[in-house]
A protein has these predicted regions:
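Glycine-/Pro-rich loop/turn segments that contact NAD(P) or position catalytic residues
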Residues: 78-163
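Structural motif
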Residues: 3, 71-72, 100
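Active-site-lining helix/loop region of Rossmann-like oxidoreductase modules
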Residues: 9, 13-14, 128, 137, ...
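N-terminal Rossmann NAD(P)H-binding glycine-rich loop of SDR-like oxidoreductase domains
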Residues: 2-27
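Short, polar loop motifs at secondary-structure junctions
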Residues: 33-38, 152
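Short beta-strand "acidic-cap" motif of Rossmann-like dinucleotide-binding folds
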Residues: 29-31, 148
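Residues in the short beta-alpha loop(s) of Rossmann-like NAD(P)-binding domains
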Residues: 10, 35, 107
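NAD(P)H-binding glycine-rich loop region in Rossmannoid oxidoreductase-like domains
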Residues: 12, 37-95, 188
């Protein structure tokens, strides 16, 4: 079974739900975790953990070596250093011979920026721009990739109704568990083919 190398799985978001799917099928998992308490918890679950920041090339390189060249990278990271962290991950992946990666960003990134409202741009536009830079670095790398741009994230159970949409404006919400399910599906596909998807559940509304 192909090992997964996870970035951003230390909290309670999409990354954590993706990790749950991997552990449920006893998949080998390597993860870079920033916080020691989360690292300890995951190590107890059987994850091979590297504690440190994804901006630290030495930590990322060690994780890439441990995962091996056949590993599949999945990143759900965010934060103020989003671009620099992903640049480090992508660069070290190339050096290690890892060739496949799924990057989770958000609606509004890249060519979907014009569809973001002015209110949204004012509220979290800086984060979206960071994510856009990360997308660009991946798209100009040697990796086979898929980029998932989920809509507003909710905490409900997976419904199986989320849709991947390409080349059109879309708005909406999606459950974190459904994002993880789509990550799992893509990670098991024969190839990713450098695709970018928006991901929403059309009729889903916040409770």
């Amino acid at each position: 079974m192909t090992p997964w190398l996870l970035f951003g799985a230390g909290g309670k978001g999409v990354g954590a739900r993706t990790l749950e799917l991997a552990l449920a099928e006893q998949r080998p998992v390597v993860a870079v975790i920033r916080h020691a308490d989360a690292a300890t918890k995951q190590a107890q679950q059987g994850v091979q953990v590297f504690t440190g920041d994804a901006c630290d090339a030495s930590v990322v390189a060690a994780a890439c070596r441990a995962a091996g060249p056949d590993a599949f990278i999945i990143s759900t990271m965010g934060g103020a250093q989003d671009y620099l962290a992903h640049r480090t991950v992508i660069d070290e992946a190339e050096k290690a011979g890892i060739s496949r990666m799924i990057l989770v960003t958000s609606l509004g990134c890249g060519d979907s920026w014009p569809f973001l409202s002015e209110r949204a741009k004012a509220a979290f536009g800086q984060a979206v721009r960071e994510k856009t830079l990360a997308e660009s670095w991946l798209q100009t790398s040697q990796l086979d990739y898929a980029i998932l741009r989920p809509g507003g994230l909710l905490d409900g159970a997976a419904t199986g109704k989320a849709q991947r949409i390409q080349n059109q404006e879309c708005h909406g919400f999606v459950n974190r568990a459904d994002v993880a399910a789509h990550i799992h599906e893509l990670a098991n596909a024969p190839a990713l083919n450098q695709q970018v998807y928006s991901l929403i559940e059309p009729d889903l509304k916040p409770a």
